[in-house]
Curated annotation (Swiss-Prot):
Keywords, ordered alphabetically: ATP-binding, Cytoplasm, DNA damage, DNA recombination, DNA repair, DNA-binding, Hydrolase, Nucleotide-binding
Primary enzyme class: hydrolase
Organism: Clostridium novyi (strain NT)
Protein purpose: The RuvA-RuvB-RuvC complex processes Holliday junction (HJ) DNA during genetic recombination and DNA repair, while the RuvA-RuvB complex plays an important role in the rescue of blocked DNA replication forks via replication fork reversal (RFR). RuvA specifically binds to HJ cruciform DNA, conferring on it an open structure. The RuvB hexamer acts as an ATP-dependent pump, pulling dsDNA into and through the RuvAB complex. RuvB forms 2 homohexamers on either side of HJ DNA bound by 1 or 2 RuvA tetramers; 4 subunits per hexamer contact DNA at a time.
Family: Belongs to the RuvB family.
Disulfide bonds: none
Entry EC number(s): 3.6.4.-
Binding residues for DNA: R311, R316
Catalytic activity line of the entry: ATP + H2O = ADP + phosphate + H(+)
Lineage: Bacteria, Bacillati, Bacillota, Clostridia, Eubacteriales
Stated name of the protein: Holliday junction branch migration complex subunit RuvB
Domain of life: Bacteria
Keyword ATP-binding: yes
InterPro entries, A to Z: AAA+_ATPase (IPR003593), AAA_lid_4 (IPR041445), DNA_helicase_Holl-junc_RuvB (IPR004605), P-loop_NTPase (IPR027417), RuvB-like_N (IPR008824), RuvB_C (IPR008823), WH-like_DNA-bd_sf (IPR036388), WH_DNA-bd_sf (IPR036390)
SMART domains: AAA (SM00382)
């Protein structure tokens, strides 16, 4: 999975390009209009009252701009962004150290917040509700509890699996926002903006071609733009036009739907090996040699959103659209029931 060009999961190579292309204001942020409107109103209201923004939960597939929004919020609130992840915070003491290092209006961004362990999560409750940290010093009969005041901070949690959050944690977020896949026009705008920052000329037609193969995900769009730029530097004349874009994307083996070999392997398995489905995700993951979480978090959301598979009580089933994509005959008995 790490080598997939169209994986929305974060890669090391994404750091420099994302940092350089990242918008610094909500007004510069393309797409996610409903999320932006809410955050714009709530940040302005918080600043008018000299309060920290209420805690924010951003959920949805990876690569849609959660970290970018956290950066913008920290900048808008006049604080510093501190970034960590659920798996990285192993003990309550780790979380206590992070919380006590914050200053007023700082933003603590926790990626994969659904993976916080329960003991760590529990010390977050008073921190989120009352800006206090309860810690226990000593053991046994000599143990005593100390309450520390915390600065006015904002916790931004990000997750691809909102259903795995416990109710007590989820209920302590004042702002819950679903991040949605981007449409092709939004991605085209992102690609044209990124092209200017990178100093490369990209035609609108070429930008749209890259956009429609970017799986609705800005991270993938910017990654593909970098690879098309490489191709253009070697094979072109300095301008990314439609032919350069198509040839580069063909070389990367990304088809017109934004699918690579793995996506097509999933569809082929459902149709050719399981008669169109339904087939359980565990069985499917085993058959194609991927982890169950990878299927659920990385591949399935886009296939569902594009209408190539559907969820059924007994598993996943390929749609007529998937049959057409693979040039398979869609027989009457394979229709969805």
């Amino acid at each position: 999975m790490e080598d997939r060009m169209v994986s929305a999961s974060y890669k090391n190579e994404d750091f420099d390009v994302e940092h350089s292309l990242r918008p610094e204001k909500l007004s510069e942020y393309i797409g996610q209009d409903k999320v932006k409107e809410k955050l714009s109103i709530f940040t302005k209201a918080a600043k008018m009252r000299n309060e920290a923004l209420d805690h924010v939960l951003l959920y949805g597939p990876p690569g849609l701009g959660k970290t970018t929004l956290a950066n913008i919020i920290a900048r808008e609130m006049g604080g510093t962004l501190k970034v960590t992840s659920g798996p990285a915070i192993e003990r309550p003491g780790d979380m206590a150290a992070i919380l006590t290092s914050l200053n007023d209006y700082d933003v603590l961004f926790i990626d994969e917040i659904h993976r916080l362990n329960r003991t760590v999560e529990e010390i977050m409750y008073p921190a989120m509700e009352d800006n206090v940290l309860d810690i226990v010093i000593g053991k046994g009969a000599a143990a005593k509890s100390i309450r520390l005041d915390l600065p006015k901070f904002t916790l931004i949690g990000a997750t691809t699996r909102v259903g795995l959050l416990t109710s007590p944690l989820r209920d302590r977020f004042g702002v819950l926002s679903a991040m949605e896949f981007y449409n092709e026009d939004e991605l085209k705008e992102i690609i044209l903006r990124s092209s200017k920052i990178l100093g490369v000329v990209t035609t609108e037609e070429a930008a749209f071609e890259i956009a429609r193969r970017s799986r609705g995900t800005p991270r993938i769009a910017n990654r593909l733009l970098k690879r098309v730029r490489d191709y253009c530097d070697v094979k072109g004349d300095g301008v990314i036009d439609i032919n350069i874009a198509k040839n580069a994307l063909s070389l990367l083996e990304i088809d017109g739907e934004g699918f690579d070999k793995i996506d097509n392997k999933i569809l082929e398995a459902i149709i050719d090996n399981f008669k169109g489905g339904p087939v359980g995700l565990e069985t499917l993951a085993y058959f194609i040699g991927e982890e169950l979480d990878t299927i659920q978090d990385v591949y399935e959301p886009y296939l569902l959103q594009k209408g190539f598979i559907v969820r059924m009580p007994r598993g996943r089933k390929a749609t007529e659209k998937a049959y057409r994509h693979l040039k398979r005959e869609f027989k009457e008995q394979t229709k969805l029931t």
